[in-house]
Amino acid sequence: MTDNIFLSVYYEDQNYHKFNAVSELSTALLIIDLQNTYTKLGKTADTIRFSQFSQRLEKIVIPNTKKLLFEFRKRNMQIIYCRIASHLKNGNDRSLSQKLEGWNSTLLFKDDYDSQIIDSIAPQSEEIVLTKTTDSALTGTNLRLLLNNLSIKTVVCAGIFTDQCVSSTVRSLSDESFDVIVPHDATAAGTMELHNAELTILNHIYCTVMSSDKIIDLLK
């Protein structure tokens, strides 16, 4: 899949390239909601509709996230994880959107296995892990303060779900005047249709969408 596919009507007639290089000193990798609970989707009778998501997570998203982690760690660049989990077992500290019935009714207690980061991409020593009860990582944590304290100007957002927590975080970061990059091959939504549609909406307005390999090539 090429980066050019994610062009909305607003930018389809423009040859728009924002990034010629990415600074190692002022760029952070933010990994959003890649947690154990989501590895079960598509593998049970009641979640079979997520089989496409499950395959993409296993074969594309996790391998490319590993690749990004390797390159960021090799360069001693900042890595931050964010996960969705409640501080209370009953989940009363969750935001309203996480308490409503249906898909968004997410109850993951912070100490439970399901809420932990997937083992194969688990954080290493001194890699920050934030816990949120919201879609946006900025709204639900002190991420904004951390990024400012760390002198971060550009944030690479990987993770799930493209059309939900990733999108909410990207928009919030953009509104706070951070440059945002989204690797299309290290993110996923419930379906490819949702994934592609959301990236097309976000691209060139709230972020720049590109491949993981392109991001690595731009690191300087």
Over which residues does each language-model region extend?
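A basic- and aromatic-enriched beta-loop-alpha substructure that forms the phosphate/nucleotide-
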Residues: I80, I84-S86
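Surface-exposed, active-site-proximal loop segments in enzymatic domains
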Residues: T44-F50, D93-S97, L173
